[in-house]
């Protein structure tokens, strides 16, 4: 029972309120007074009658994933549904309705929908986009809302603008997306067949023409042989016509469409104009020239029984027998072979050769293996020798020749490659130096000694005469450096003169340098070594050639050689002096030059190691240690004694070297190794007491090293006779190489 509305029985609803404002519910919109605050609360924020409060927070929990907006999270993601709709066809006997298949695309980024109908052959209706992409509203009475993803399912109808679309299936992406959203998908439905389309298919299947239409399909040939061209080298003899001459042509056959084109190879200075093409690209008929045809005579197909209006859409029948059709024969790839003569619009062209690709094509397609080329080019006439005017005597011959080769004179070009290869490199001077004597009857000039230098960089020769005491001749430069002509040549001639080369200089050679005869009697060690290292350039220093000459002696001379060696070496030591060896070879009938004899002696000489002065080595070592202020000799004694387990006063060379390196002994490796070898005993162990005593510059100083005691490279060699480098010859080794096996001299 309710309480009566008396004072004290009613509840004051304003108790505890602090807001009593009124919301604006009425306003003008486009000049019309209307209610605009349907969503606004009443006085003090209380809800009006019939209003429901909107939840401040969602009832659904926040899921995992990115918080990106829908237009970014679902960009380029579209749901695709297969659907159809029935369209009524009034006033037609063949069909009452039409089943039209379509695709429904739902764009997740903005909930827009697009309906597209695929194109079907001979449908007779416009197809494509039926409903453009936009948001489609729901049917009334909810037309204020739009379709979203929850309104779509398989085997379900949707209504777009009063047209029912039956969704039958969807693609895998759509299916997975809907399942992940929790949508329970219906089983797929089948699309009913269109009655009229079925009838048309039955009629087309029953239609059997009397003959199949001729199909002209060149796409396959184009796709298989595109950019493949056969190249042939041809010859056309046009010498019978006036002002005609043989022509050289290049034929290109395009496999993509069986067309040809030809180019003419115009030789230089032929008097003919160069044209872009000799024959434009196109099919070449075999029986050319052909008469001109009327328009319509040559067509792809023959049309018979034309009736009705002529033009587009008019009926016609094709002639299956091709009565009266003109057939033209064109050249194919099978007609183009080497040796074949083709008719190029009345010109007989001979195919003489082809390139590698063309040969491979015919080999793979036709099995042709032999491609004999036909020689059609006449041998070019010999070029006339260029007449050069004779040398006038002014300047060098090279300079005069360059001035005759063009209107603008140019300086002669030097051999830059030879200059870079033979130029001086460090101590390698690439200069061959010989000792020469003047060939004259004057007793004063006979004793004069000359240094003849040959520079390999530019084949120049310089002669220097070293001064001799009490000779009465002032030494110095005898011949300026330059190229020297060989004797017996004319001065004023058109041909280039011959100059002395490096092969003309060897020990024993006679040279005529500017009308002055010289004989080369000796050379320095670098010259001998260089000529032996480049034996292919210097035959006088080729040991193989020299031995072959010695092998060519007769058997009597071989016995003479053996007897000479036996008499010269009674002790059978296998060696003899070089002078005796030289006398023996000079008497043989093999015509060995002095340089060849000296080369043979250098190869089979007995090498003797030069004695090293220990005092000089110790002086050099103490000088280095003194400059570096090295005084750790007592510590080194302790280190050597610690390593000497047997207390014998000796250590191996390896252990001594390790200790010296540990104390950073400031000596070079070569000097340290030589000192350790000198202080090694018979057991190849180092007497470290003697070694340390020898290098101790504090307690045992040795005399300082004098400048004349040091070994230097004599760059200013003056031709003095040094100590002979070859003293003794190992003739036993020589006999073994010459006669093929070691020979017992005493038995012979």
UniProtKB/Swiss-Prot annotation:
Gene Ontology cellular-component annotations: axonemal microtubule
Record has Lipid metabolism as a keyword: no
Subcellular location: Cytoplasm, Cytoskeleton, Cilium axoneme
Start and end residues of each EF-hand domain: 556-591, 631-666
Residue intervals of the DM10 domain: 75-182, 226-366, 428-535
Keywords annotated in UniProt: Cell projection, Cytoplasm, Cytoskeleton, Repeat
Organism of provenance: Danio rerio (Zebrafish)
Gene3D superfamilies cross-referenced by the UniProt entry: 2.30.29.170, EF-hand (1.10.238.10)
Record flagged with keyword Cytoplasm: yes
Function summary: Microtubule inner protein (MIP) part of the dynein-decorated doublet microtubules (DMTs) in cilia axoneme, which is required for motile cilia beating.
Tree of life domain: Eukaryota
Pfam families reported in the protein's UniProt record: DM10_dom
InterPro entries: DM10_dom (IPR006602), EF-hand-dom_pair (IPR011992), EFHC1/EFHC2/EFHB (IPR040193)
Annotated protein name in UniProt: EF-hand domain-containing family member C2
Any Gene Ontology biological process: regulation of neuron projection development
């Amino acid at each position: 029972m309710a309480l009566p509305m008396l004072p004290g029985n009613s509840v004051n609803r304003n108790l505890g309120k602090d807001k009593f404002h009124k919301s604006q519910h009425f306003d003008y919109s486009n000049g019309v007074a209307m209610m605009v605050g349907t969503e606004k609360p009443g006085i003090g924020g209380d809800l009006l009658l019939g209003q429901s409060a909107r939840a401040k927070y969602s009832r659904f929990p926040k899921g995992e994933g990115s918080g990106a907006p829908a237009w970014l999270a679902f960009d380029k993601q579209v749901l695709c549904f297969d659907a159809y709709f029935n369209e009524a066809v009034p006033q037609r006997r063949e069909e009452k309705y039409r089943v039209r298949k379509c695709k429904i695309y739902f764009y997740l980024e903005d909930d827009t929908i697009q309906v597209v109908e695929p194109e079907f052959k001979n449908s007779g209706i416009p197809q494509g986009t039926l409903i453009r992409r936009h948001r489609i509203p729901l049917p009334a009475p909810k037309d204020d809302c739009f379709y979203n993803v929850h309104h779509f399912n398989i085997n379900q109808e949707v209504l777009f603008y009063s047209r029912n679309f039956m969704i039958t299936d969807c693609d895998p992406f759509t299916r997975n997306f809907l399942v992940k959203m929790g949508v329970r998908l219906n089983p797929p439905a089948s699309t009913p067949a269109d009655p009229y389309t079925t009838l048309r298919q039955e009629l087309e299947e029953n239609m059997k023409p009397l003959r199949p239409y001729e199909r002209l399909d060149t796409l396959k040939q184009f796709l298989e042989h595109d950019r493949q061209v056969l190249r042939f080298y041809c010859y056309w003899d046009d010498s019978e016509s006036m002002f005609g001459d043989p022509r050289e042509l290049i034929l290109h056959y395009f496999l993509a469409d069986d067309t040809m084109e030809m180019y003419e190879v115009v030789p230089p200075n032929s008097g003919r104009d160069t044209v872009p093409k000799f024959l434009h690209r196109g099919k070449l008929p075999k029986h050319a020239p052909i008469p001109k045809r009327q328009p319509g005579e040559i067509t792809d197909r023959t049309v018979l029984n034309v009736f009705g209006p002529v033009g587009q859409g008019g009926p016609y029948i094709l002639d299956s027998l091709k009565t009266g059709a003109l057939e033209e024969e064109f050249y194919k790839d099978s007609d183009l072979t080497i040796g074949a003569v083709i008719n190029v619009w009345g010109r007989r062209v001979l195919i003489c050769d082809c390139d590698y690709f063309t040969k491979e094509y015919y080999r793979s397609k036709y099995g042709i293996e032999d491609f004999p080329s036909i020689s059609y080019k006449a041998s070019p006439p010999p070029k006339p020798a260029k007449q050069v005017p004779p040398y006038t005597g002014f300047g060098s011959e090279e300079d005069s020749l360059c001035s005759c080769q063009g209107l603008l004179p140019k300086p002669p070009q030097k051999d830059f490659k030879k200059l870079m290869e033979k130029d001086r490199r460090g101590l390698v001077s690439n200069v061959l130096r010989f000792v020469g004597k003047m060939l004259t009857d004057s007793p004063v000039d006979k004793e004069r000694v000359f240094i003849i230098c040959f520079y390999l960089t530019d084949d120049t020769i310089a002669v220097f005469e070293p001064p001799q005491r009490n000779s009465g001749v002032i030494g110095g430069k005898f011949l300026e450096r330059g190229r020297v002509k060989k004797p017996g040549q004319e001065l004023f001639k058109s041909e280039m003169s011959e100059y002395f080369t490096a092969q003309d200089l060897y020990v024993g050679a006679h040279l005529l340098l500017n009308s002055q005869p010289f004989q080369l009697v000796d050379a320095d060690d670098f010259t001998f070594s260089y000529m032996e290292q480049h034996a292919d350039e210097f035959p006088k220093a080729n040991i193989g050639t020299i031995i072959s000459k010695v092998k060519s002696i007769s058997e009597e001379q071989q016995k003479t050689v053996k007897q000479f060696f036996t008499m010269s070496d009674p002790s059978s030591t296998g060696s003899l002096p070089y002078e005796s060896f030289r006398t023996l070879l000079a008497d043989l009938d093999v015509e060995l030059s002095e340089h060849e004899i000296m080369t043979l002696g250098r190869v089979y000489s007995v090498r003797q190691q030069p004695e090293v002065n220990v005092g000089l080595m110790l002086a050099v070592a103490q000088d280095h240690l003194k400059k570096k202020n090295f005084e750790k000799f007592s510590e080194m004694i302790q280190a050597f004694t610690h390593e000497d387990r047997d207390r014998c006063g000796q250590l191996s060379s390896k252990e001594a070297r390790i200790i010296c390196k540990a104390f950073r002994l400031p000596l070079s490796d070569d000097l340290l190794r030589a000192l350790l070898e000198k202080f090694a005993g018979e057991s190849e162990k180092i007497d470290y007491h003697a070694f340390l005593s020898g290098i101790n510059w504090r307690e045992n100083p040795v005399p300082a090293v004098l400048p004349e005691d040091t070994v230097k490279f004599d760059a200013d060699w003056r031709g003095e006779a040094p100590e002979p480098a070859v003293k003794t010859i190992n003739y036993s080794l020589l006999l073994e190489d010459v006669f093929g096996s070691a020979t017992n001299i005493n038995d012979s």
